[in-house]
Regions:
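A fold-level detector for beta-propeller and closely related beta-sheet-rich head/sensor domains
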Residues: 1-239, 251-254, 258, 262, ...
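Solvent-exposed, conformationally flexible loop/turn segments
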Residues: 244-246
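Extracellular/luminal ectodomains and secreted, surface-exposed scaffolds of diverse proteins
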Residues: 263-297
């Protein structure tokens, strides 16, 4: 691939603000004040700082009314990654001109539900590529394109353009990995990362793996749901009318007449940040006459889902980095693309196929520790991967 696309010409050329082979070595580091810093490694000099557009709105929260103190916003809390990729970095100029560029991709970590990307081919002159932000409270996804134009995509109605469906994106603790995969037989540069942290309280986001298109300004290719795969007993799906004012729903009307509280619990999806409760009449371990009540009427025309799941007090999410196996990392990988391994707070290990062998995006649960708050089997870290001499892969 690199030979076919003249990678050596790029490495030996002068598109990096000078000869690329002699390009400055830069240390990129995010800070809780909301700034990504670029330091020259040879002398520690700071070359520049960058505030991503999805962080700007939080800066006003830093000043504190208390003397000699500030409020922490966590800002640019995630670790950035840098890689050379071959793509058209000027997609809005009416022509297609792919070339090798060095891109930096960063996640906000505890600073928010978002990512940002820069072109750092010339380390003295970085340029903005795109940024993404998910606001779960306002139920909106924000996207800044390569020209800095901001577009918003609300989903209170339950619908959103699939290219911007970041509804399940939590705090982006999971460091993105930049890889090249085959999509419809063509090479494509993508980033893959976990859905992040949800505070262990919000089931609406965090339990997914995202694959985004780096050649198309961060638009989505695929969201793979990892949520409660082993625990869901049944889903009850219904919707609100277009001019909805209803705050109470009789769940028997949608097929949920009762459940056993000794083994099961109910989870509600689709209402965003609207507070709710489920009430009923208890007879022993059985709850009957179930009512779903919201503090305010949900928006009209949305889809709601009540899931009956095996009893667990864990709200699942994927805060850990992913383990990604590519041919760049081992000669045992006889495929294009990557094999990805994700861990989650439910204690599961999931394999995701992003190779050209088998079915693209196929998932397999390899391990389930059945974690609870009592046994504490949460997994916050990525699995360590090794390949032994007879080509067997081991996860630790």
């Amino acid at each position: 691939y690199r030979l076919q696309n003249n990678y050596n010409n790029f490495k030996n050329g002068s598109t990096c603000g000078g000869p690329c082979v002699n390009r400055k070595e830069i240390i990129y580091a995010g800070a809780n004040n909301g700034i990504l810093h670029a330091f020259e490694s040879s002398n520690g000099e700071e070359l520049w700082g960058y505030i991503p557009p999805n962080v700007l709105g939080n800066l006003e929260k830093i000043p504190s009314s208390k003397a000699n103190s500030t409020n922490a916003i966590y800002g640019v809390d995630g670790s950035p990654v840098v890689k050379d990729i071959f793509f058209d970095d000027t997609p809005n100029d009416g022509s297609t001109n792919p070339r090798w560029r060095t891109i930096l991709l960063g996640a906000l970590g505890a600073g928010g539900h978002g990512l940002y990307a820069l072109d750092v081919t010339d380390p003295d002159n970085p340029t903005h590529l795109f940024a993404i932000n998910h606001d779960g409270t306002q139920q909106v996804v924000q996207h800044w394109d390569v020209d800095g134009n901001k577009n918003e995509f609300g989903y209170r109605s339950g619908n959103i353009d699939p290219q911007y469906d970041y509804r399940k994106l939590g705090e982006t603790w999971s460091t993105p990995r930049i890889i090249r995969i085959k999509v419809s037989g063509k090479d494509k540069w993508v980033a893959v990362f976990g859905g992040g942290y949800n505070g262990a309280v919000n089931p609406n986001y965090g339990s997914a793996v995202f694959i985004i298109d780096l050649e198309d300004q961060g638009r989505l290719l695929k969201v793979i749901d990892i949520e409660d795969q082993a625990n869901v007993i049944h889903n009850y799906v219904f919707g609100t009318v277009s001019n909805n004012t209803q705050t109470e729903f009789n769940l028997a009307n949608y097929g949920l007449t009762s459940y056993d509280i000794s083994c099961c619990t109910l989870k509600v999806y689709g209402a965003g940040s609207i507070r709710y409760s489920i009430t009923g009449d208890q007879n022993g371990n059985t709850m009957n006459n179930l009512k779903l009540r919201f503090d305010e009427a949900p928006p009209g025309g949305i889809t709601l889902m009540v899931s009956k799941v095996n009893k667990t007090d864990i709200v699942n999410s994927i805060p850990a980095d992913l383990s990604v196996i590519t041919a760049d990392g081992t000669n045992k990988a006889n495929y294009n693309g990557a094999m990805v391994y994700a861990t989650d707070l439910e204690g599961k290990v999931t394999k995701i196929n992003l190779t050209d062998k088998g079915t693209l995006y196929e998932t397999t649960t390899l391990f389930n520790s059945q974690s609870t708050s009592d046994n504490g089997r949460y997994i916050y870290t990525r699995p360590e991967v090794t390949i032994n001499n007879d080509s067997n892969l081991w996860l630790y």
